Amino acid sequence: MTRAAVRLGLAQGGLCFWEKGCMTEMSEPTIRLATPDDAPALLAIYEPYVRQTAITCEYEVPSVEEFAGRIERTLKRYPYLVMELDGRPVGYAYVSSLNSREAYDWSVETSIYLARDVRHGGLGRKLHDALKQCLIAMGITNMCALIAVPHDKDDEYLTHNSQDFHAHMGYRLVGAFDRCAQKFGRWYDMCWMELVLAERVPNQPKPTWFPDLLA
């Protein structure tokens, strides 16, 4: 996906995909860039993950103000995307730096959340693919995901679905941690999965931060 395609897609109110040499705009659902004003709607999606699952290791639901600040901080460097169905936000995806040290600039940690009433309908793939295309245009080489997984078998708080989803997206398992996170009084494993977006070469050009890509 070219930088011009990213700019045009977002300017037209929906992300565009680069397919078979031509740019085609998505029909419903639509994907757009988030703003801090989206915080209440996106927090409503996130809240059940905090209260009812071990998918996120966060214990307390952040305030709307804190969540808006997270969006704003992300957008200073990276894409933060919102998926809508009939004008209603039903999912969001963003990335953060894998590490604050400059040598890690080519690698990001990904996060993706869908409203629980629209999961398992293929929307996660579309949202992830849109995020991936933005990162490719930026010059990011590595998408990394830190995923909570059950230590033994699935339970009411956590399944292997997230790990399976990322495997279907092309990620490979690159690391695992034994019972390193506790939530709801239970211990869970964590795993790192990685998707390589571009060849890593000596003197790799620095990524273009997302706001500069849209300028």
What are these regions (language model features)?
Residues V61-D117, H128, C134, M138, ...:
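Acetyl-CoA-dependent GNAT
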Residues L43-R70:
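Conserved GNAT-fold acetyl-CoA-binding loop/helix
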Residues T30-L42:
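A short beta-loop-alpha structural element at the N-terminal edge
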Residues P29, R88-Y92, Y188:
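Glycine-rich phosphate/pyrophosphate-binding loop shared by adenosine-nucleotide-utilizing enzymes
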Residues H120-I136, H160-D164, H168:
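Conserved acetyl-CoA-binding loop-helix of GNAT-fold acetyltransferases
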Residues R179-A215:
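C-terminal "cap" of GNAT-fold acetyltransferases
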Residues L135-L158:
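Conserved GNAT acetyl-CoA-binding A-motif
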Residues S111-H120, A148-D152:
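A short, internal acetyl-CoA/4′-phosphopantetheine-binding micro-motif in the GNAT/acyltransferase core
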